[in-house]
Each structure stands twice: as structure tokens, then as C-alpha cells.
Amino acid sequence: VSNEPLIPELPAPGKIREMKTDPLFGATVLTLDNGIKVVLKHTDFKKDEILMTATSPGGSTLFGAKDIDNLKVFNDVITLGGAGNFSATDLNKVLAGKKVSCSPSIGLNTENVNGYAAPADLKTLFELVYLYFTAPRMDEEAYTSFENRMIAQLKNLELNPMVAFSDTLTKAIYDNNPRAARITAGDFKQISYPRIMEMYKERFADASDFVFTFVGNIDTDSIRPFVEQYLATLPVKGRAEKANPAEVPAICKGEYTNIFKRALETPKASVVNFWSGKMEYNLENILTATMLKQILDLVYMEKVREDEGGTYGVQTSAQISSFPEGQTFLQAY
């Protein structure tokens, strides 16, 4: 298996339609003849590493209610079968000794491919990208093994009373929206492996609106042949897509309090306070939220743990989301 090439046959290379320099970051921006954009930024932080990220608008919000359970395991399942002519096990054998990784995934409002490689293994990274777009592979045996492991883990997890606490919190915050709920053992009755792979092919059937970004020890002249061979030949349909904001779980408005009791081996009380509001998504607000979290951590550590001795600690989080609109979240636990 290890002697077989990852890609037995390749189409004729595509072409770079346009090349320009980004004035802000000094990156090289390529537009390929199939519509894909490629951003190349040379850095000297690590000589043995090139990072890659690729994104396209769309994401899980483009699927309806019937696929909610499938989406819960989507990212865990899509590479179980490997790619091309290689099972996941055989693919790992082929990649043994190489510094390379490539992972497709779907987010709330994007499709993504993330990866990295040492400069010497950069061609392999491009080959993996090409395979995950053009030749995803199913493996029913691998999926059955995954399903059995997950069901056993989830049944064991659901014995933990704190899971009930977390589930209740999620239901309260998102007004019992099924898209926000975690996966349960019972969900596997509705999950379909063939449907997930069908969804995957649908989302990655059109590469024309993807932007690939490579950062690291890049030589532009050396990487261009890989771009032309493996990215400029990806399938395209010219779809103009954007995520569907109507399918994003909305945070419940107004004040809500939920107090419930559950038997524990070691009695304790857990309290979560959650606040949300509208806020513009920009760098200033992101930094402000980060500093707020750090300040609250210091204050709670001093007042609640050290002065009052009332708890082992308080955890906080503060963040801002940009989709479907600017929104801030603050949590103290």
C-alpha cells in the first residue's frame, strides 16, 4: 500500500489568472482560473512549518431540521473512511514519517480545510487537499466501530449528574433549540452515515468560493506548481452562497432563572450566570472582552475564593460573535 501514489491520475494543471500583493500584510494573492483565491504569506517564525487554512461561506446553517443529528457527528465521521484508494489506516501508514496533516470540516457558517506541513512535505498536503475534495471515501466497518464506541461513551457520560446541569443550561440559553443540543446515545437512531457523506460531497462540490491561506516558510516560486496542479483543478460550479442566519440558535431574551436539585455522591452547589447583548464585532471590542475576563478572574479569585473561602474557584468567559450579528456573551461559573 505504501508504494502506491496517493493520486494515481491527475488532470492537466490549471492556471493562475491574476497575482497581486496585498499592501497591508505584504502577502501574495493569487486568483486561479477556477475562481479559487490563494493567499501566500512568508514568515520566519518556524523554518519547518507551513500552516494552511481554507474557508468558504455556507456551513451547517444550509441544512434543514432533518439533518440536525447528522450534523452533530459530521466532522467526526467524514474522514473515517480515508480518501481516494486508501482507508484511514492505510493513509496513516502512507503518511508515517511525514510532518503533514489535513482536516476538512464544517462550521456554523463556513466549510473549512485546515492543515500543516513541513516544507519538504508540502506536496503531500496539497495531495490530501485534492483527495478530500475529489475522492472522499466511505468505510461502513469504520463507521460501525465509531458508532459503537460513541454510544457506550455517551451512555456512561449521561450517568454524570453534571451533564444534566449542562444540558439544562443549554436548553435555557437557547430556548430548547435542537441545533444547540449536545449529541446523545439515542440520536444515533436518526444518524445516517451515507447521508453525512452525501452532505459532505454537497458542501465540497464547489471550490470556487474557497480562499486558501498559507503562512510560514513559503517560497512563492516553489509553491506555484502545487497551486496550479492541485487547487486550480478542483471542481467548481460557480455557486454564490452565504450562510442562513435564520438557522442559527438564538439566545433566549429576557431574564430566566432555573433552580433544580439532583442527588450527588459529594453534595455541592453549582451556579452559572450568563449575560448576553448586542455588540459590534471589531478588534477593540474583542480586546475589551478579553481584558474583562482577565479582570473578573482576578477579582473572583480574591473575593470569592481567598476572602470568602466559598468555592474552589470561579471560571469566566467573555467573547463576541460576528454571525449572524455582533453579539457578546459573558459567563461566570
Question: PLM features: what roles do these ranges have?
Answer:
Residues 1, 46-79, 83-135, 147-155, ...:
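M16 family metallopeptidases and their MPP-like homologs
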